[in-house]
């Protein structure tokens, strides 16, 4: 199986012109597999030309058979059209993707991805869990300890304190710990940003930030191949490791979940690293269960 018709060497390139055909391919794979093979922000980056793609053109460039996508230094994302599988295309794309990016995501860690990873001597090096629970949530009675008050985020006032605590709380996290002032500004400019759903635990008196819970509402997407209802997310929950007060995570998580329920949402979700045992325990106590496993695979000889 060759990756391209004879005379056209395979090459990574930016592909805003091919974005519509690739979106159709990604939708078809998502509908067949029950999980989107390419994440939302990577799909946006294909459309804007910010990502590089390697396309398996199949029979015609308007109807691509598979794609690997590379964005910045992140693990690549790969999919093959459901009706073009088991023809060696995934193997070629994943091999090229790992050569370029060093790693590849497998959203949902489906049996085909596991089998292909094993055939290519790739091993799981990161497991990101998506956990969910129904809303509303019964009152759990978590109260802030003495000397701590919960208030909501005030744009224009709380950014620097938030970024400081976020960097400390997520010092070892591959993405969240890197958030800076401009990245925060971009998120706050999004339609979904809602300061009333962004809770801060502060000292009282003193108003020193100790911990935060930033919630995010994903609107329903009834159209398309993979329709979903609205979802409320525990987007970022972080406690300053220097705060020295236990229980702030539970207090803030409950407050945010009650807020999402008040907004009429019937499902809450969150993402957590599987090896973050304290966080997984906290979410299990709050009634969350694993909904989906997302795995980063790397060659066995790499760390
Ligand atoms: C994973 C995926 C890319 C494989 O694409 P593909 O073109 O079907 O894969 P290939 O034909 O190159 O398969 C190569 C090897 O992977 C393994 N494999 C692939 N699909 C398999 C399946 N459904 N069951 C068992 N083994 C499978 C086999 O070892 C296969 O070799 P073989 O056909 O000689 O037995 C495709 O199923 C897909 O798009 N899945 C959704 C997105 C995803 O999970 N991406 C992450 C990739 S790590």
From Swiss-Prot:
Q: Where does 1D-myo-inositol 2-(L-cysteinylamino)-2-deoxy-alpha-D-glucopyranoside bind?
A: 175, 216, 233, 271
BP term (GO), one: mycothiol biosynthetic process
Q: What class of enzyme is it?
A: transferase
Name the Enzyme Commission number(s) assigned to this protein.
2.3.1.189
- The answer to whether the entry has keyword Repeat is yes
Catalysed reaction, written as an equation? 1D-myo-inositol 2-(L-cysteinylamino)-2-deoxy-alpha-D-glucopyranoside + acetyl-CoA = mycothiol + CoA + H(+)
According to the entry, every stretch annotated as the N-acetyltransferase domain falls at: 148-303
Q: Which UniProt keywords apply?
A: Acyltransferase, Repeat, Transferase
Question: Which positions bind acetyl-CoA 1?
Answer: 78-80
- Family listed: Belongs to the acetyltransferase family. MshD subfamily.
Q: Which PANTHER family match?
A: L-AMINO ACID N-ACETYLTRANSFERASE, MYCOTHIOL ACETYLTRANSFERASE
Subunit annotation: Monomer.
The task this protein performs is described as: Catalyzes the transfer of acetyl from acetyl-CoA to desacetylmycothiol (Cys-GlcN-Ins) to form mycothiol.
Protein name, please?
Mycothiol acetyltransferase
